[in-house]
Amino acid sequence: MKKIGNRAAAVAAFALAGAVSLAACGSGGNGGSGTGPSGHVTIKVGCEPPKTQAAQRSFWVQDVAAFEKANPNITIVSDDTNPCDDPTTFNAKLASGKMDNVFYTYFTDATNVISSGQSADIQKYASQIANLGSLQPDLVNLYRQGGTSGGDLYGIPKSNYTLGLVYNRSLFQRAGLNPDQPPTTWAEVRADAKKISALGGGIVGYADYSAVGTGGWHFTAELYSLGGSMVTSDGKKAAFDNSTGMQVLQNLQQMRWTDNSMGSKQLLQYNDLPQMMGSGKLGMYVGAPDNVTFIHQQYRAPYANLGEGPMPGTGGTLLGGDGYMFSKNDTPAQIQAGIKFLNFEFLTPGAGQFNFARAKAAGQPVGLPQPNIWTAGSSVAQSTTSDKEKNATIPVANFQPYLQAAPNMTAKIEPPQAQAIYAQGDRVMAAVLTQRNPNLQQLLSTFASQTNTILANG
């Protein structure tokens, strides 16, 4: 499951089909060309923002033009197919060998792509990657075999997020709670949810998902927060049919039925929770920091009323994110050109995604604690943070509880075959939230059995 900003509708068009004619020279495929006359290189790069995201699209077009002006021997062909990584078609496209020269991936795709043999090992060009030593090692290792540094590298991370607790600062104040100190344990979430629900008027203290894959996603996040794992270390078996998995279900059952702090409307999905938060009727829910800007933009909720706290619990938090990998058909020149463009667009403070002054001038939100790809304390992290705060258009203080806890949180990636597993998890979450006395052990064991089948067939 992805953060709010990635939930775009699928578009059937294949962008810039006519650009294939540019590939007449050289040996590279996938819409780009290898080194042509006078050393000219053409590369096709995935995930150009769609036209519906006008500001982001404009920034991309500006950056491509600036990059090509600075590098006249490189032509960028942008692919705006969206979603950038459609789970329903990604594997088939990968198997066909028709990926872009520089193709977009979620973190959860990396292992499968490497195993498929469809991506190029770029380790020999690692010295050309800007600020590689300042990137969080755990993020870089996601693009290595086995997730550890072993002399190979198949991709470059560009952004990441970890889940936390989105909360309504205004309701906290009304309930006599400190809006600068959101709960940090599930026991505190439960206690605060009761106080917020007691305000009446249809206000819900805490809400959770249970439909369209979102329920299984949040079950995973809440399991991680308690120190649990969805799958065994080898990724072959379910690992949540235990006391930790049971604790997730019991906690929700108690808040829903004993405390009555989760409201009666259930089977919630995607935008339901941001909408409830935006209407001032919800106190807390698990979500990434970008939910705050989405709630403000979509539902006109004042930024002053919104905050982000850490994921409750001491176990950890769910990590998501994305990056780029390189087609196995790329020539060395295409790989190096691709790295140079990714450096420009995603890995240089003050440029591309880190051009906060431009974003501010365009009326875009600046100040979110994501992406957070740099190692804490590094000079790159410090300069990026300083520039972001200088250009902030949202109250960065409202994210301080999240930021202060982040260095001590263990971030865990989603399980393999995540979407299929999440769909089965919906049934468990729905049962707990719609039935007063379901058989929790039976629900958990059935979910584990279904997960084992998914992993075995993956």
Each model region followed by its residue ranges:
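Hinge/lid segment of periplasmic solute-binding proteins
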Residues: 107-162, 218, 305-307
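C-terminal lobe and pocket-closing loops
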Residues: 295-301, 314-319, 325-423
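Glycine-centered hinge/linker elements that transmit conformational signals in sensory
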Residues: 192-194, 234-266
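Conserved C-terminal helix/tail region of periplasmic/extracytoplasmic solute-binding proteins
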Residues: 173, 179, 394-458
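Short, solvent-exposed loop/beta-turn-alpha elements that line the ligand-binding surface or hinge
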Residues: 123-138, 182-184, 205-210, 228-248, ...
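Extracytoplasmic/periplasmic substrate-binding proteins
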Residues: 112, 218-221, 250-344
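Extracytoplasmic/periplasmic solute-binding protein
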Residues: 145-158, 163, 173, 187-238, ...
